């Protein structure tokens, strides 16, 4: 059972920002933001044609500045948010804005990646998440499964909840909270939990993970020294409401139960340098992706702490032949393991993410502008499904 070869797409600029087009559930589409100091920055809309194993692309100009983070609206295919650097009077400020892509590009196109006649189009600015008083924005996260009207931005030591007005033409600050403590505390990453009616957000600052209740903007849990060095990213298990994964500069990936934060449930130590990105599969939460500046992407099978630790159990009533019953998967917990290590990158991998339209497909992005699309090995896919 031979697996498909990875598909590689090269951007002409350096890049570190990647997101799936979250609201698109039919086509496989990713958005990539570039980092160039000399030239106009771009957002590449990457369409993956699964049947023919080829990439089609469109390019949007992002003239506001180099892109450090990108996120897509969960409700509107055409809307996205970027965090970007703006230089004024030799001062660099990290800003955030919400944009709309041209209508005809929301559902992709069939332009060849090598078409020299293709011209870049511009984004329409919908609103700034004006944070001049709060500091530099690290990331913008959308309320999951929402109507695309609520976002949170993390700016230095502030967590800011915004309400986007109709057609996203204005962002109104609904509430905020500030990190308290010694020293220069700054947020590095955040994720909005899909559980608890979307009322919880987790943030990373230095080596600490914190949970926040968005209704009161108060802290609900705190995991101090979650990592030995800076925490780079985190993600919520989509199927187990108290489970959270984090990664950091100590080369580790840790899994937490937020009801008991004294120690991690599990720790992975497969990378040899900083781990920049961790992502749970949206459907099969035992599949966990990580990307690191050791230039590798690792796909792990964390089945023992997943929502199906015994595999896919079949109800006795579904089995007509008792002989078949013995052929069913055993009721013993399955073993955690590294499924595959992907080594198509030659530079630091800053972002990994799953496609929103296909649970078996994922993309990774390294700083040299190389985007790689890979699939979960077929043997494992059928093992999970059957």
UniProtKB/Swiss-Prot annotation:
UniProt xrefs under PROSITE patterns: WD_REPEATS_1, WD_REPEATS_2, WD_REPEATS_REGION
Official protein name in the record: EARP and GARP complex-interacting protein 1
Task performed by this protein: Acts as a component of endosomal retrieval machinery that is involved in protein transport from early endosomes to either recycling endosomes or the trans-Golgi network. Mediates the recruitment of Golgi-associated retrograde protein (GARP) complex to the trans-Golgi network and controls early endosome-to-Golgi transport of internalized protein. Promotes the recycling of internalized transferrin receptor (TFRC) to the plasma membrane through interaction with endosome-associated recycling protein (EARP) complex.
Keyword Phosphoprotein: yes
Any one annotated GO CC term: trans-Golgi network
Family the entry assigns: Belongs to the WD repeat EIPR1 family.
One record GO biological process: regulation of insulin secretion
Modified residues (N-acetylmethionine): 1
Summary of subunit composition and partner proteins: Interacts with two multisubunit tethering complexes: EARP composed of VPS50, VPS51, VPS52 and VPS53 subunits and GARP complex composed of VPS51, VPS52, VPS53 and VPS54 subunits. Interacts with SNAP29.
WD repeat residue intervals: 132-172, 182-222, 226-266, 270-310, 344-384
Location of Phosphoserine modifications: 320
Organism (species): Mus musculus (Mouse)
UniProt KW keywords: Acetylation, Golgi apparatus, Phosphoprotein, Repeat, WD repeat
Subcellular location: Golgi apparatus, trans-Golgi network
């Amino acid at each position: 059972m031979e697996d498909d070869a990875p598909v590689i797409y090269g951007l002409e600029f350096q890049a570190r920002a990647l997101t799936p087009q979250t609201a698109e559930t039919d086509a496989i589409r990713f958005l990539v933001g570039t980092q160039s100091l000399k030239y106009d920055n771009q957002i590449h809309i990457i369409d993956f044609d699964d049947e023919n194993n080829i990439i089609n692309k469109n390019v949007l100009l992002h003239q506001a500045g180099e892109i450090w983070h990108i996120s897509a609206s969960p409700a509107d295919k055409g809307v996205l948010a970027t965090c970007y650097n703006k230089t004024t009077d030799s001062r660099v400020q990290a800003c955030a804005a919400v944009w709309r892509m041209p209508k005809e590009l929301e559902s992709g196109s069939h332009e060849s990646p090598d078409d020299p006649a293709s011209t870049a189009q511009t984004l329409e600015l919908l609103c700034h998440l004006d944070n001049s008083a709060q500091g530099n924005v690290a990331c913008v996260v959308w309320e999951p499964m929402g109507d695309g009207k609520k976002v949170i931005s993390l700016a230095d030591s502030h967590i800011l909840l915004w309400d986007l007005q109709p057609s996203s033409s204005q962002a109104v600050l609904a509430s905020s909270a500030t990190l308290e403590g010694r020293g220069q505390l700054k947020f590095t990453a955040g994720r909005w939990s899909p559980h608890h009616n979307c009322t919880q957000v987790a943030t990373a600052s230095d080596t600490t993970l914190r949970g926040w209740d968005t209704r009161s903007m108060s802290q609900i849990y705190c995991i101090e020294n979650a990592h030995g060095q800076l925490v780079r990213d985190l993600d919520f298990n989509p199927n187990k409401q108290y489970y959270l994964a984090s990664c950091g500069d100590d080369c580790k990936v840790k899994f937490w139960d937020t009801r008991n934060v004294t120690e991690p449930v599990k720790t992975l130590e497969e990378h040899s340098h900083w781990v920049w990105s961790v992502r749970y599969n949206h459907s099969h939460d035992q599949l966990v992706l990580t990307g690191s500046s050791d230039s590798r992407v690792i796909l792990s099978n964390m089945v023992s702490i997943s929502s199906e630790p015994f595999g896919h159990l079949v109800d006795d009533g579904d089995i007509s032949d008792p002989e078949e019953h013995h052929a069913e998967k055993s009721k013993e917990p399955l073993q955690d393991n590294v499924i595959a290590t992907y080594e198509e990158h030659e530079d630091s991998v800053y972002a990994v993410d799953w496609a929103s339209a296909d649970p078996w497909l994922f993309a990774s992005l390294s700083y040299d502008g190389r985007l790689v699309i890979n699939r979960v090995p077929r043997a494992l896919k059928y093992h999970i499904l059957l």
